[in-house]
Amino acid sequence: MKKLFTLLTTAAMLCNMFAVTSFAEKSDKPTSNTAITAVKTAQWRATESDSTTYDLRIHGWSGWETAAYMGFELPENFNAENVGKAELVLDTTSVTNSGTAYLYEADYSAFENGMQYTVAPTYTEKEIMSFTSPSNTGEFKIDVTDYIKSIKDKENVAFRIDVKSQNNNTNWNIGSCTNSG
């Protein structure tokens, strides 16, 4: 008889976390927690005239758009077939308004840790999903189970989060890390 066990794997970069719950067939395996540290975060801002250094800010005001990039290394024994649930867990430190946000697959090799970009690092323009951004500060979870289950033969995963220019001052800040270029 197959017995279910849960392996909670988290990847964290300061206040950002990627949590994967995996299932396996072994009955002698206890529940285990393993931390995987996120290796990089970066910031994109739409205008060169904006010289502000942002802390993973997601903003949709027309002409002043920003997006956050997060990169995670997967463990050597990662197997997408065993994923039961996967969540991107973010710590919202400030927010002006809630709105529709978008999650994209980013090119892990296209951005460096701590950089501020005015030319957006490469990402897949078809969003993985849209979701309503938080309206309050604190922990916020995005279910990325379907995406994580679909990845094959990858050593890392990266995300871009943004809001489309909607003249909506979302001004959503994630975490408290300062990314200086």
Question: In which residue ranges do the predicted regions lie?
Answer:
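Beta-strand-rich interaction/scaffold domains
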Residues: T92-V157
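C-terminal segment of classical bacterial N-terminal signal peptides
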Residues: F5, C15-F23
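Ser/Thr/Pro-rich, low-complexity mucin-like regions
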Residues: I148-S176
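A short beta-strand element within beta-rich, extracytoplasmic domains
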Residues: F72, E81-V95
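Flexible, small-residue-rich N-terminal segments that precede or flank a structured functional core
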Residues: E25-N77, S94, E105-S109, V163-N168, ...
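Sec-dependent signal peptide recognition
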Residues: K2-T10
